[in-house]
Regions:
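Mid/C-terminal beta-alpha module of Rossmann-like enzyme folds, strongest
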Residues: 233-300, 338-341
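N-terminal Rossmann NAD(P)H-binding glycine-rich loop of SDR-like oxidoreductase domains
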Residues: 21-40
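Conserved Rossmann-fold NAD(P)-dependent oxidoreductase catalytic core, especially the SDR/UDP-sugar
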Residues: 110-154
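Amphipathic terminal alpha-helices
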Residues: 2-9, 20, 316-324, 328-350
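Substrate-positioning beta->alpha
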Residues: 161-162, 189-195, 210-232, 242-246
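NAD(P)H-binding glycine-rich loop region in Rossmannoid oxidoreductase-like domains
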Residues: 55-57, 61, 65-106, 114, ...
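Conserved C-terminal active-site "lid" loop/helix of NAD(P)H-dependent oxidoreductases
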Residues: 220, 244, 260, 283-292, ...
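Catalytic helix-loop patch of NAD(P)-dependent Rossmann-fold dehydrogenases
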Residues: 137-184, 205
């Protein structure tokens, strides 16, 4: 987390402090923040990932290097633990479908199999609201919403399959839960905000649609908080077992108003150019076809999924998380932006 855990919060995760915990994908944005929070709690935490993480090793955090698609490597990392946070995933909206399925679907199967064989009783899965995004506006939607029947990107398709199987595996011997944080941002972010800023600075970002769409966003500390609460629940009452939870800030934001306000703080030109959704969606369709036919690896500047995400509203009810997990955002949106701007100022080369 970007700020130390307070004593009052530590009491919210008292059962976790005595656990031996594995975090897959512990070198990523959410994963690393989760690892550091668990370390602050006093838990015995280890990491599994593709690379070595010298910064974590310097903190005496064991790092198991391996491929999530290697079932034996996953089993070795899981062995000896009694709680697993499965955060590792191939993110993004473009790339070979086979890679997304191998890493996100089969990789999750490997984690599930390892937890079963090693008798790990708790598995918390990092999912995404993209599993229910089915082209339409989502305003205050809750977890009763069905999975998307026609996902527009391999990432969403692979996460649907993984979440379905992990939740279906819930049983008295292995309690599972899925956390769906939306658009996670904050200090340490190497993807969402940096990409927005890069596109804004280059003039390649346009407002898609009429600019009125609202979205959920999630400050990093709040995403971590939700994961910790979920694990704590499974270790105690287990009322959350077998369920998924949407996670976000105290309320949704107008996407383009929020982006432009952030850009103003960062001295990035505001987004003023507008593109109709139909035009952006058509461009995405064409670019996807061209990139596929030419076997281009780089992400198209526009895709169908991206066009819809930029134009449609997608925000969710957090009532289930509030009722069963006791979730409330620790950091409000305005304070989160202040912390993000300060972090960017401290880490961006002059």
């Amino acid at each position: 987390m970007s700020t130390p855990l307070t004593s009052s919060l530590t009491s919210s995760y008292s059962a976790l402090a005595s656990q031996k915990i594995l975090v897959t994908g512990g070198g990523g944005f959410i994963g690393k923040a989760l690892v550091l929070a668990l370390r602050d709690l006093g838990a015995e935490v280890r990491v599994f990932g593709r690379s070595r993480y010298p910064d974590l090793e310097a903190l005496s955090i064991p790092c198991f290097q391996g491929d999530i698609c290697d079932q034996e490597a996953v089993r070795r990392a899981v062995a000896g633990t009694n709680c697993v946070f499965h955060v590792a995933a191939k993110a993004g909206i473009w790339g070979p479908r086979s890679e997304y399925m191998a890493i996100n679907h089969q990789g999750s199967r490997n984690v599930l199999a390892a937890c079963t064989s090693e008798q790990v009783p708790i598995l918390v899965y990092t999912s995404t609201p993209s599993v229910v995004f089915n082209r339409d506006n989502l305003c205050g939607a809750d977890e009763s919403l069905p999975y998307a029947s026609r996902p527009l990107c391999a990432y969403a398709a692979s996460k649907i399959l993984a979440e379905q199987e992990l939740l279906a595996a819930n049983c008295p011997d292995l309690k599972t839960v899925a956390i769906r944080p939306h658009l996670v941002w904050g200090p340490g972010d190497t993807n969402l905000i940096p990409r927005l800023v890069e596109r804004g600075q280059s003039g390649h970002l346009a407002m898609v649609g009429n600019g009125s769409n609202k979205v959920d966003i999630t400050y990093i500390d709040n995403a971590v908080h939700a994961h910790l609460l979920a694990a704590e629940n499974l270790l105690t009452s287990a009322s959350a077992a077998g369920q998924a939870f949407f996670i976000g800030q105290e309320k949704p934001v107008n996407l383009w108003t929020w982006i432009n306000a952030l850009f103003t703080r960062l001295a990035v030109p505001e987004v003023q150019r507008r593109v109709p959704l139909a035009m952006a969606y058509g461009a995405g369709t064409l670019l996807e076809l061209v990139h596929t036919l030419r076997r281009r690896q780089e992400e198209p500047r526009m895709t169908r999924f991206l066009a819809l995400q930029l134009a449609k509203s997608h925000w969710f009810s957090h009532a289930r998380a509030e009722q069963l997990l006791g979730y409330r955002p620790l950091v409000d949106t305005a304070s989160g932006v202040d912390r993000l701007v300060a972090w960017l100022a401290a880490t961006t080369p002059c």
